[in-house]
Regions:
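Hydrophobic alpha-helical segments within soluble ligand-binding/sensing domains
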Residues: 18-26, 137-148, 153-178, 282-303
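N-terminal signal peptide c-region/cleavage motif recognized by signal peptidases
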Residues: 12-14
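An alpha-beta-alpha
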Residues: 52, 153-203, 309-324
């Protein structure tokens, strides 16, 4: 109807009105509408979003030119926590998904597992293309496999083969085989800990985990795992929003505890953890960029999402903090030292093998 109305207006107007717009002006007309949905507002999600927008820009899709973005961040009440708060989040996600389905955008970006898992059914029924990012394991959000998400859905995942990641951990810390992990009911966190436990068994290592509430102080759980030197020999940080809440309080306390007790802290996700000696995992910004490349194909070429495989960072990033290693009196094996490169903020990047 809008096209017919425009045609009629042009026919009735003066001859000057039917002159074509300059190419530059046409390119700047809003062309694509993208909705973004996420739960909580944490730094890693912002990195993923920035990567996504960067990929669209690289494909000539840009806000103010031919892109409109509406971003919704569903709050999680960390102070209340618990079942009812989580149920409320699920309901909010579904309400937003219904609103988005009615708005009929060209594409939806879901950041994180909860937004993806609880919005996808509604968006699939409405035939609105869904691209996700910052998901630990696609299978946990309803995908058929790591690479196939079924009708109407594709995206990028933070998935890293946990056995390979722990092999790198063991190369840096060969004398530590008992790993402690503290997590919440965060879906990415639960999946990450389960994967770590399975990968550790294959390597003759062991993971002992403690679940806490998002409002809990982490220190009692650390003490229970450490058992005054009789328990775990290192701590590993899973992909859990808990560590990004309250200005990184849990992460800071974990780093301090590790320093006081000469226990290495490693993180199995590229999330800022003050005091961590080793980082192994996919980078949120890089994974967000991968999602953006898939979105560009859907928007520009009208490619169906199910045609596009789920992408992931093939070689995870490995960073070490040399100052923290020195404080722990740990020296890297010569084979790793020989292939290190200087990274930002004084870190060393190790070659992934």
């Amino acid at each position: 109807m809008k096209i017919l109305a425009l045609a009629a207006a042009l026919c009735c107007g003066p001859a000057l009105a039917i002159e074509p717009l300059p190419l530059e002006a046409m390119e700047q007309q809003p062309g694509f509408k993208v909705e973004v949905l996420q739960v909580t507002d944490i730094e890693p999600y912002q990195e993923a979003y920035a990567g996504f927008i960067g990929a669209l820009r690289a494909n000539q899709i840009e806000a103010g030119r031919n892109l409109r973005v509406n971003r919704v961040k569903v709050d999680f009440d960390a102070e209340r926590g618990g079942f009812w708060s989580k149920l409320g989040v699920v309901m909010r996600i579904r309400q937003e998904a219904q609103r988005i389905a009615a708005a009929r955008p060209d594409l939806v970006l879901a950041i994180g597992s909860p937004a993806t898992k609880y919005a996808r059914g509604i968006l699939e029924d409405a035939k609105v293309p869904l691209v996700f990012t910052a998901v630990a394991n696609p299978v946990d959000v309803g995908c058929v496999s790591l690479a196939d998400c079924g009708p109407g859905v594709t995206g990028s995942t933070l998935y890293t083969n946990m056995r390979d990641a722990l092999t790198m951990v063991h190369r840096v810390f060969p004398n530590a085989s008992r790993i402690g992990m503290v997590h919440t009911d965060d879906e990415n966190g639960v999946a990450n800990v389960a994967a770590a436990a399975g990968g550790a068994r294959e390597l003759g290592m062991a993971v002992t985990a403690r679940q806490v509430a998002k409002t809990d102080n982490i220190v009692p759980a650390l003490k229970a795992l450490h058992q005054q030197g009789e328990g775990v020999q290192m701590f590993a940080v899973p992909l859990d929003t808990y560590y990004g809440l309250h200005r990184y309080e849990a992460a800071i306390d974990l780093g301090d505890y590790g320093a006081e007790h000469k226990l290495p802290v490693v993180t199995l996700a590229m999330v800022r953890v003050p005091g961590a000696a080793l980082y192994v995992g996919a980078e949120f910004g890089a994974v967000g960029y991968l999602a953006g490349t898939q979105a560009a194909k859907i928007l520009k070429n009208h490619t169906k999402p199910e045609v596009l495989p789920v992408l992931r960072q093939e070689k995870p990033t490995v960073l070490v903090d040399p100052a923290r290693l020195a404080a722990l009196d740990i020296r890297l094996p010569e084979a790793l030292l020989a292939r290190r490169t200087q990274a930002r903020n004084g870190y060393w990047q190790l070659a992934w093998e």
